[in-house]
Amino acid sequence: MTATIAFAEEAPQNADSIVKTLLAATESGNFAEFQQQGDAAFQAGITKDMFSKVSQQLAPALKGGYDLSFLTSLTQQGYDVYLWKITPNTGKDQFVAKLVLKNGEASGFWIQ
């Protein structure tokens, strides 16, 4: 059995731009900006109330500033999946952001 050593990769510019916009919209509570990043299914699947609850929960950690570190990319069922580590400057919990793209638009976005 052989192993291949992989070196750090960078997120594609489009994915990087979308995740930063989604995080900024989450931080500021800007639902319209958040929705603009996604395809029709993404937009239909996230209500303003759902977004507001998540924004209220995460905004305090994001507003203090954070470091966004790209982790890796995957291909799953024809979708491009990208993962980042979010380290808030508050020194509290870290998060993982998962962005799923199809044809250059967000099809899914999760922060865990």
Locate each region found by the language model.
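Short charge-dense sequence patches
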Residues: 3-9, 46-49, 95, 106-107
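Exposed beta-sheet edge and beta->alpha loop/turn motif
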Residues: 72-112
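Short, low-complexity N-terminal intrinsically disordered segments enriched in polar/charged residues
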Residues: 3-28
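Short solvent-exposed beta->alpha transition segments
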Residues: 16-17, 21, 33-80, 93
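Intrinsically disordered/low-complexity terminal segments and short unstructured peptides
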Residues: 1-3, 89
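Short C-terminal domain-edge/linker segments immediately following a structured domain
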Residues: 7, 65-67, 99-103
